[in-house]
Amino acid sequence: MKDKELLALLKKNGWTVARINGSHHVLQKNGKTTVVPIHGKDVPIGLLNTILKEAGLK
């Protein structure tokens, strides 16, 4: 999955961008925080699974 697709999926599920630090977007929802790196490439599967678990989507 591309990084921008992941970002769009999280935003669709209620996550908002709290801040951007370089190429890392920090998203928040209900006091939870997750970081999505935006490098223009596919997100590695291990990192993708971790972000989806943190977001409650897996």
PLM regions and their residue ranges:
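C-terminal structural segments of small proteins and small subunits
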Residues: 4-5, 11-16, 26-58
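Arg/Lys-rich, often Gly-containing low-complexity segments of ribosomal proteins
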Residues: 20-24
